């Protein structure tokens, strides 16, 4: 079964959104991982509803599927990367992040997206882990209530350096929340290479029941740097075999190339990344 491949708009920030979408469709991508940010779809825009409506029509015309990502660096605070997070010591800061995530869930529902991606945030200085986990579960419970009502999976990403950094941390969160159906996983293949004890392919297989979104790129062990394919250490043929099994077993979402620091070469990397992944697929089927 052919993988449904996408490219992240956080790697195409020098392009207008329509230009990025037409590029991906022309190249042959199946979808887009759309990061809500000021240069593409600003979730704080006063005319957000009109923008979402226009975007929905464009996606239908181009036959592109979509997943919504919420990892914009400065969308809520121009001075703090990814701040305020769900772990902010200030309750108003946490509430601002919750409001943004709830808006993302509504946008995703309006666009017919597969899932909404999110993450925990970095443990702030002076905050003990127990308090941080309580804040995380309390705030995500609010978002999950909205997501459940709209039938939209909330796909939490284990992120190196964050409170929720590993697959084990994801399962800890599931336990704390009572294993809600709406809570899923964003599985980043590079992060598996960076942090997990198991191989990336084994991570795909072990996490399969909870995967709602997949990000893919190359990476080196112990170094959190998203790299173009071939520039890191990942053995990709077994990973694609595992992803093919995931898709065959009913995963409906996208597998999205994630190169957020390469927008300067975004169009060429979108082309070469698709060529690389489709080439591996063809080799596996030969």
Name every feature range the model reports, one short phrase each.
Residues 8-12, 37-39, 71-73, 121-123, ...:
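Active-site beta-loop-alpha junctions enriched in small/polar residues
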Residues 1-6, 13-30, 60, 106, ...:
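Histidine-acidic metal/acid-base catalytic patches
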Residues 43-54, 85-99, 127-138, 161-165, ...:
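Alpha-helix N-cap and loop-to-helix initiation/capping positions
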Residues 1-109, 209, 271-286:
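N-terminal pre-domain/capping segments
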Residues 2-3, 11, 37-38, 87, ...:
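Generic signal for short, ordered secondary-structure residues
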Residues 18-19, 61, 75-184:
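Active-site acidic/histidine proton-transfer and metal-coordination neighborhood
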Residues 34, 67-70, 113-120, 154-157, ...:
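Short beta-strand segments at enzyme active-site cores
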């Amino acid at each position: 079964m052919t993988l449904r491949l996408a490219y992240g708009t956080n790697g195409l920030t020098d392009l207008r959104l329509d230009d990025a979408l037409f590029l991906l469709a022309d190249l042959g991508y199946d979808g887009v991982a759309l990061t809500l940010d000021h240069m593409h779809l600003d979730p704080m825009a006063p005319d957000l509803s009109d923008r979402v409506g226009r975007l929905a029509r464009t996606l239908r015309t181009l036959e592109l599927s979509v997943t919504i990502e919420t990892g914009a660096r400065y969308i809520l605070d121009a001075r703090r990367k990814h701040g305020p997070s769900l772990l902010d010591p200030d309750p108003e800061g946490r509430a601002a992040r919750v409001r943004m995530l709830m808006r993302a869930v509504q946008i995703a529902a309006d666009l017919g997206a597969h899932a909404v991606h999110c993450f925990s945030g970095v443990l702030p200085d002076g905050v003990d882990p127990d308090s941080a986990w309580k804040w995380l579960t309390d705030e995500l419970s609010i978002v999950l209530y909205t997501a459940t009502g709209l039938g939209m999976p909330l796909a939490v990403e284990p992120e190196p350096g964050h409170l929720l950094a590993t697959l084990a941390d994801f399962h800890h969160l599931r336990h704390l929340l009572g294993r809600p159906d709406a809570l899923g996983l964003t599985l980043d293949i590079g992060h598996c290479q960076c942090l997990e004890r198991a191989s990336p392919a084994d991570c795909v297989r072990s996490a399969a029941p909870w995967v709602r979104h997949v990000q893919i790129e190359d990476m080196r062990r112990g170094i959190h740097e998203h790299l173009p394919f071939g520039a890191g250490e990942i053995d990709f043929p077994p990973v694609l075999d595992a992803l093919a099994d995931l898709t065959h077993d009913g995963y409906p979402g996208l597998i999205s190339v994630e190169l957020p620091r390469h927008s300067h070469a975004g169009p060429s990397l979108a082309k070469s990344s698709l060529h690389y992944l489709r080439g591996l697929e063809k080799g596996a089927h030969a």
